[in-house]
């Protein structure tokens, strides 16, 4: 067990009241007891000054200044010192039993600012026999001594053997030594660390719960995970550097692209212009020869055009004269056609209206019959309704009478009276004065027979009435038809006129039937007449063209002569055509072959250029495609070998990277699962415990632990046993060692050390022999040594890999070039030169063109004669079939005769069309016109009389029937019989009344419905009559209009008129077409003559100019060629494939390149000026100068340390290979450097879990601490909700926020800050940058919230605040917090210092009077359990039972102040024991 270091003593030299005083410090509690002003605070101030000699922090205020920051100008230190040199020295024995003396030299600085000068120093190796006061003072005599200066102290110590004296210029160095030697618990690297330490001491000194510490518990208790932050910062710095390098590579690539672009565009700019001038020079020579040839050809063409112009002018004049006559004839034919079409439309209307009239006539007759029947029915309905009405009235009267007489006494009298009334009414109606009730039956039968007879007579008359009405309507219909055909006439004349009309209709129909044949005959004759006239016109025109008058009989002879002439000319023309065709075919073949060669020439030239480049790149000469393919196979083999070697080097480099990454893991854990298991089991990796082992001891410890060097050290194996059940995610062999990770040693094994090996006795029957490894990896030093070796090997491999990658890429590019050549140019690269063959073909083409021109001039005359003869034969072929027509003189008379007969037939057709339907209707009913049915009115009167007779007979029979019915009323047998009879009669009367009323209702309804129907029939009849009259009037008007037109409208009239018009239109169109052709030809001929004239003048002028231009351009071209050859750029500029482009294409190519070059050289003043000068089109040699300047500029920019060539094109090629390799390597490096968000979350979460476990262990040490009502103290650590959400998102939902972490514009810290803002938009980030926020989020301490809680009395656990606790409880709670902080610092710093050092623990407590005895005893117990030293300042009445107590009394003797000190150890013993060395040195 390592002993904890202790403060042995505190020495004050030349302090106020203390000249040279040494306080021996107790191992636990040292109490300074004394009254006010005794020097207790001064003693503690000296101790604190020696611990933290930082004037920016020191501020010794009394307790009345609590919370003040500027109580006095000197902050309490200047007034505690005396003038001169002062010392405050601490004597320490550390865990290694080394004596260390550390302290400060203080001296007041003169001036009103009351400043103090402090110099820290340290002494090592001082013998224990020498006291600090002996070093710091010099005894002058028995009563006097003086304080030595710092230089004197240094000289005194240097004289001692083995003693080291160190004076420090900075507080950081002073504290670094104190940390290394175990004086302070924490390495105080910065002012912030010193401030935390001072605040801790200050809080301990003045007691209570320090708000400064409680607010910053995270900074005090939680260690800064600087390794993680530094790893992230290094990663981001490496990524940033990597991206900057990539950006620089991209800039270099853009520069490379610019150079490549500059070369390409400069070559296009100059080469296009160079080849354009070369082409133009050749073209100008060809044009000069062509102009001279065209000049002679144009002169001959002008003479031929002048002769042609005279002939066409004569023919045009003839056509202009004939056009007027044709236009007049065509207009007359068009007008006649319009009249015929109008007459036909009128005829169609007439036929349509006649059909409508016939239909209306039939409908009108039908409607008249319907109306008559409806009127008869209406009269019958009225009679029935009237009879029904009378019967109902009669029955109602009878029923009313019987109802009135229903009284038993009056009924009989009433009925008897009614019977008498009925008898009288029957006598009156029947004219029978002798009628009695007994004879009524006989008379009833008589009158019923009379009624039957009257009814039969009425029905007979009704039938006769119907027949007469039908005859009357037929007569009227026949009469109307006769009147419609003949016009108005008397009724008695209708029969005679109708017979005459029928006989005339038969004749007219016969003539109408002949009209169609006459019309066909007339059409045929008219067609022949037109053909005759057309043949006469053609004959006249033929004679005009031939210039001679021919008879009809001479035409056949002339036709034979012309055919013979055509045959002879056709043979000559045919032979000429064959000869010309042969020449043209040969010429076309030459041209086709030339075009094929010209299309192939650029391809062949490109193939040759590519082949030359391959030869230059490979250093080989190729004569055939087979040699190229064989060399490609060699390249493939070479590339395969280089790739294999490169991959082997890359695999070795990756293996080294993985090993470096594995060795760089914190704690030496090669398996990340071991870290998780160590946290799970609450243990520490064995490699982490031995992380600080030296390089010399690493082989020993590596062999000592053997396979268990990766074991986990746990406090208790029994607690881990339960967790091992079901454990799967772990290495195959997991070693667990029980022990205290804080004080672990190698005593767990029995070991015998041999030469470079060890024998480990694991058990009585099991030993393990392990040799020292040649490459030990146990401990940080061994791993770092191995990492340095691996880094060196990796650098050499990287250089070899880069060289091999360059060679591979160069071989691949050469392979790609060969592959492109084989795929694109191998088929044509080794063929014959097409340009040589083109020159030969051009020579032969010139010979053929001259032969064709000579042949064309000879063949032209034969062709003209052939065309004239052929035209004459064509005209005769049209005339010869019409010779018979030309000889027929009677054709016109026959046409006139047929025309007259057709007119008569047309009149008959019109009569039949107009009256045919009427005659057809009249013929079957003409017989009814023989007699006029005038007796129809008498028949109507007889029918009305019969109806009246029938009604009278019906009334008489009814009256007699009533008498018969009332016959019982004339004699009654008795009252009962009379009553019964009355009841029966009453019932019968009621039934008859109901029947009569029903009959009356039906009669009325039938009459009403029939009246409405009759009205509808009458309306329809009136509408039909109106329509008939209207259409009749329109038909008459149409007949009148047709007569006014005066044109015969038969079926073929329109066709004949249209045919005539079309023939004239055709003749007019042909004439106009020919005239237009002649005018156009004449205009074209005149224009051609003008063009030829202008062309002659232009050709003469152009020929002279071209000849002068050829001569003048020769001098400039010679200068260009001289400049090109002198600078050796002809190979770059004379691009033969450009010779096959047109001048416009070359000029466009040069202009595009010029525009690109203006942008490319905008930043280069020299090239910009040269380019501007080269734009002069009259000075082509300046473009060559620009090209030479560009190449010179690029040669100067080539880095000879990287690229080994002077050619800019080859330099660009090598730059592309090198940049491609660097880009790929840096991209892979960036992917390796990048860290995932899930890994960040896991690292932070594991760190939080580890620190929570550590705080939990610290809480266990404070569970038994109690002060007053405070039973226990604990520290709560919770993760903030916002930060917990951030960790969850980073680990589980990071895919949703890849836009932040995959962005090249954001570092990981900035992306983390952006994500935090996105998840917590409600939090105001202030003016902090995302980088600052991200760095804070990488610190796990910002994820935690910490607060102190106390278990006080009945309140339970509450937050530790001064207002809720008593003063003593607050002091005790604050002291507990400070103890926890100190212990946390020790745990944090254990890995930073040696394993054999346990630092000193010491705290202060001023004004301990505020604590009771139990609280002070608790402090003593806490100090004993934690091995902590405590210095207490207490008043005189406080005397602890344990520890060392110093009684301080300040005295004044001869105006000289000094403090008298008496030291006592405890008060439990009866006799106090005085400590040695308590006499006052004063």
Curated annotation (Swiss-Prot):
Residue ranges with Basic and acidic residues bias: 1056-1065
Coiled-coil ranges (or none): 326-472, 507-602, 832-1110, 1209-1265
SUPFAM superfamilies recorded: P-loop containing nucleoside triphosphate hydrolases
Main function: Plays a central role in chromosome condensation, segregation and cell cycle progression. Functions as a homodimer, which is essential for chromosome partition. Involved in negative DNA supercoiling in vivo, and by this means organize and compact chromosomes. May achieve or facilitate chromosome segregation by condensation DNA from both sides of a centrally located replisome during cell division.
Keywords: ATP-binding, Cell cycle, Cell division, Chromosome partition, Coiled coil, Cytoplasm, DNA condensation, DNA-binding, Nucleotide-binding
Annotated organism of origin: Klebsiella pneumoniae (strain 342)
The UniProt record lists the keyword Cytoplasm: yes
Cellular component terms per the entry's GO annotation: cytoplasm; nucleoid
Name by which UniProt lists this protein: Chromosome partition protein MukB
Single GO MF descriptor: DNA binding
InterPro entries: MukB (IPR012090), MukB/SMC (IPR050308), MukB_hinge (IPR032520), MukB_hinge_sf (IPR042501), MukB_N_dom (IPR007406), P-loop_NTPase (IPR027417)
Keyword Cell division among record annotations: yes
Region (Flexible hinge): 666-783
Pfam family, any one: MukB_hinge
Assembly notes: Homodimerization via its hinge domain. Binds to DNA via its C-terminal region. Interacts, and probably forms a ternary complex, with MukE and MukF via its C-terminal region. The complex formation is stimulated by calcium or magnesium. Interacts with tubulin-related protein FtsZ.
GO BP terms: cell division; chromosome condensation; chromosome segregation; DNA replication
Entry note about domains: The hinge domain, which separates the large intramolecular coiled coil regions, allows the homodimerization, forming a V-shaped homodimer.
Family classification: Belongs to the SMC family. MukB subfamily.
Annotated spans, Disordered: 1056-1075
Location(s) in or outside the cell: Cytoplasm, Nucleoid
Gene3D superfamilies reported in the protein's UniProt record: 1.20.58.850, 3.40.1140.10, Immunoglobulin FC, subunit C, MukB, hinge domain
